[in-house]
Amino acid sequence: MELKLLNENGQEGAVVNASDVVFGRDYNEALIHQVVVAYQANARQGNRAQKDREQVKHTTKKPWRQKGTGRARAGMSSSPLWRGGGRIFPNSPEENFSHKVNKKMHRAGLCSIFSQLAREGRLSVVEDIILEAPKTKLLADKFKTMGLDSVLIITDTVDENLYLASRNLPHVAIVEPRYADPLSLIYFKKVLVTKAAVAQIEELLS
């Protein structure tokens, strides 16, 4: 698979030969959906909670006698049928939202995403991204020159200047190959991968 190599002006020059196993795989929508949903589910904190009829603070006194009033029978005001009563099936912090995805499926899903990004022209390779100082303006000007507004940068090692300069830019993220997740790959309009990171991705996923 040939990947486009961009220069500092965002123009396409030479090409980089990449592994077909990682960047030339068929598009598998069902697998990608499963991998993305599992990633989102595993990121949930599970901190939502409601109270059931046992946990709400209400008196246990019977509101009125069982018979003779003409009203519907009632046992206590904490009943789920009453306003302010407990929930029937409340959410609990102990809920487990995690989804298990096998390593082979996870790798195959990432390969399918990388391959589709390459086919759509959303994935490009750069020699390296080097900043002389940790200045957000320097990085913003570089992206403006390259015509980028929403970009995920995958680099072999995260340079401190690059990391500090990118923190205040919206729709910009910088990660190492081992931390590339399926949701970020799909979310950003453009994915820039350094030459050294391409080799690391191939080593991780092939």
UniProtKB/Swiss-Prot annotation:
Protein name per Swiss-Prot or TrEMBL: Large ribosomal subunit protein uL4
Pfam families associated with the record: Ribosomal_L4 (PF00573)
Function: One of the primary rRNA binding proteins, this protein initially binds near the 5'-end of the 23S rRNA. It is important during the early stages of 50S assembly. It makes multiple contacts with different domains of the 23S rRNA in the assembled 50S subunit and ribosome.
UniProt KW Membrane keyword: no
Any Gene Ontology CC annotation: ribosome
Disordered: annotated span: 45-78
Subunit structure, interactors included: Part of the 50S ribosomal subunit.
Compositionally biased tracts (Basic residues): 58-70
GO biological process per UniProt: translation
Name of the coding gene: rplD
GO MF term list: rRNA binding; structural constituent of ribosome
InterPro entries: Ribosomal_uL4 (IPR002136), Ribosomal_uL4-like (IPR013005), Ribosomal_uL4_dom_sf (IPR023574)
Family: Belongs to the universal ribosomal protein uL4 family.
PANTHER family (alphabetical): 50S RIBOSOMAL PROTEIN L4 (PTHR10746), LARGE RIBOSOMAL SUBUNIT PROTEIN UL4M (PTHR10746:SF6)
Keywords, alphabetical: Ribonucleoprotein, Ribosomal protein, RNA-binding, rRNA-binding
